[in-house]
């Protein structure tokens, strides 16, 4: 089957984990890995897998975009450089999947709003953050039943799973995740907190979600909605587990999640990598299917 060719920008933890997932995709073919450090482990792994690489940043990729038929690019660098990367590549007709908190394109959380993006001509979609991908489906599971006045999430991740790019973007992480809790999750007001835990051995990703509903919560409907949404996320992140809840206390609905990774690049405790990269891969696969269908229709 024909595949859509892709480039990955940023060979850190997220970019390298994503590479493993794209190599298993039935519709995506990673062909380039872009970095800035010649000694990067991610670039070395990409070369081992047969990808072309450059340590000259996106400028090193641009001359090859058309010739190598790159249609989709994943940016796993940082919010500070994403806009420049996106402008250069979208000008060449490349669709950007943004894994930074830059959020210059609309937020995408696959089980909540991916279908809406397929119907639009967006050239750039933003995957929010790892904390957003883990928690916003739960906020939405409550808000689709009844209005949510306030949604608060706490994402706790292992220090070892958090690379330098994410550490530079902590403020952007909280702003972007809070915004997406409102715009995608459906809460009127959102707040996000990230805890980077230095414990050894590293702890698995844990997420706590609190929602304050308008009026007494509909216990049965919210419980059913939460369980249904967990199954939706598990379609692309099998290690997404409801540990407790939903717990009801007055107007507060609390959900407690755990996210175990597949162990592709970092061990299974790094579920924060997995939920981000799996969501990005799932999103890109839907775009690729759309591209392939359009090509077949005009053939």
UniProtKB/Swiss-Prot annotation:
Keyword NAD: yes
Documented EC number(s): 1.2.1.10
Highest taxon of the lineage: Bacteria
Enzyme class, spelled out: oxidoreductase
Pfam family, one: AcetDehyd-dimer
SUPFAM superfamilies: Glyceraldehyde-3-phosphate dehydrogenase-like, C-terminal domain, NAD(P)-binding Rossmann-fold domains
CDD domains: ALDH_C (cd23933)
Entry keyword set: Aromatic hydrocarbons catabolism, NAD, Oxidoreductase
Reactions catalysed: acetaldehyde + NAD(+) + CoA = acetyl-CoA + NADH + H(+)
Signal sequence bounds: none
Coiled coil (residue ranges): none
GO molecular function, one term: acetaldehyde dehydrogenase (acetylating) activity
Biological process according to GO: catabolic process
Annotated disulfide bonds: none
Location of the active site: 130
Binding site for NAD(+): 161-169, 272
InterPro entries noted in UniProt: Acetaldehyde_dehydrogenase (IPR003361), Acetylaldehyde_DH_C (IPR015426), NAD(P)-bd_dom_sf (IPR036291), Semialdehyde_DH_NAD-bd (IPR000534)
Family, per entry: Belongs to the acetaldehyde dehydrogenase family.
Protein name: Acetaldehyde dehydrogenase 1
Protein species of origin: Burkholderia cenocepacia (strain ATCC BAA-245 / DSM 16553 / LMG 16656 / NCTC 13227 / J2315 / CF5610)
